[in-house]
């Protein structure tokens, strides 16, 4: 049997991830003999901590070992298993990414034009998100249709956000757009 593909591993990992209330955000398989690696990225609305990731990693290792013993997987000379969460440089591509980063700054890059806004609430259908931008002393509220979202990445912020921005980001979609 050949080294397992991402599709085969995803089919094994996703039910276990779901049992931990994790979403499988990324899976990368690198075949390089004894230096082969399987890198798994998971996330959840409650942000997995290191202890949860350790337990999940152990269970994935046991799952892979059992599948190898049954002849369903073959990692060959071995592999390194890496389990982590997506970093802040991970693009926001799905509604859950926007929901999980509510209140944070996001850098949007559309047609070479960059802008920075604070992420607010999503509408009930999770098709639009509120964006809050400061224009001098005024706050401007716009909505972004997620289906046509430009490249968006969370911005690291060192200063505490202004109270009026935070309050607007915490308001509901309908309140913010009224």
Swiss-Prot record:
This is Ribosome maturation factor RimP. It comes from the Bacteria. The keyword Ribosomal protein does not apply. Signal peptide: none annotated. NCBIfam families: PRK00092.2-2 (NF000930). Required for maturation of 30S ribosomal subunits. Belongs to the RimP family. It is found in: Cytoplasm. The gene is rimP. One of its GO terms (cellular component) is cytosol. One of its GO terms (biological process) is ribosomal small subunit assembly. Keywords: Cytoplasm, Ribosome biogenesis. Its main location: cytoplasm.
């Amino acid at each position: 049997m050949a080294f397992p593909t991402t599709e085969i591993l995803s089919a094994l990992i996703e039910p276990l991830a779901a049992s931990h209330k994790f979403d499988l955000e990324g899976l990368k398989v690198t075949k390089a003999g004894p230096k082969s690696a399987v890198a798994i990225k998971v996330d959840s609305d409650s942000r997995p901590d290191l202890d949860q990731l350790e337990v999940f990693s152990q269970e994935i290792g046991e799952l892979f070992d059992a599948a190898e013993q049954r002849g369903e997987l073959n990692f060959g000379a071995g592999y390194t298993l890496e389990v982590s969460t997506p970093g802040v440089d991970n693009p926001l591509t799905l509604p859950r990414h926007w929901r999980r980063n509510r209140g944070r700054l996001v850098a949007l890059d559309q047609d070479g034009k960059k802008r920075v806004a604070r992420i607010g609430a999503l509408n009930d259908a999770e098709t639009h998100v509120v964006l809050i931008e400061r224009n001098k002393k005024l706050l401007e509220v716009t909505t972004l249709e997620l289906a046509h979202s430009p490249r968006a990445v969370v911005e690291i912020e060192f200063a505490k956000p202004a109270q009026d921005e935070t309050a607007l980001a915490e308001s509901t979609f309908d309140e913010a757009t009224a």
